[in-house]
Amino acid sequence: MPRAKGERRLEILKALAQMLEAPKWERITTAALAERLDVSEAALYRHFASKAQMYEGLIEFIESSVFTLANRITEDEANGLRQADKLVEMLLAFAEKNPGMVRVMTGDALVGEHERLQARMNQFFDRFEATLKQSLRDAADGDAAGRAATLLRYAIGCLHQYAKSGFSRKPIESFSAQRRYLMT
């Protein structure tokens, strides 16, 4: 029985994400991806017009997953500081559960790819910072923008450290210990 087109696309994206999880990561070629899936490169291009489109699929997964959870947090938690705390924790937990996506989020996997991909990840982080700022608008010190920027930069630093350590330095572990310094 033939597979549905969407099923094969998902299989390709999962394989790409798994390849990005390798601790000693190297740039991924379509030839290596095709070999991993035991298909021809032409078969990949029947589902995606370019490798950039494959990365866009991963970025869409990141955006959809993170902002669905962010919306849930902002709806369920009334306190702005607790919202911000939970938002950062959620982003770090997402990264820990999806190490291949961290390579995309930090831009490592996007080096040498189409520049619109990095621009899209930059937009993702701008949107996440805006979500933090909205949560912190009633913070005691009144500097929602400064607090949001600090929290975002902390989270991005954790993502980089996680990727550079070959995924051994878990971002949630450090956040659990450091949240009291960040959230006061």
Role assignments for model-derived ranges:
Residues D38-F48:
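Short hydrophobic/aromatic patch on the recognition helix
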Residues F94-K97, M101, L151-K170, Y181-T184:
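Amphipathic C-terminal alpha-helical segment
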Residues M1-R36, Q53, S65:
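Basic, helix-initiating cap at the start of DNA-binding domains
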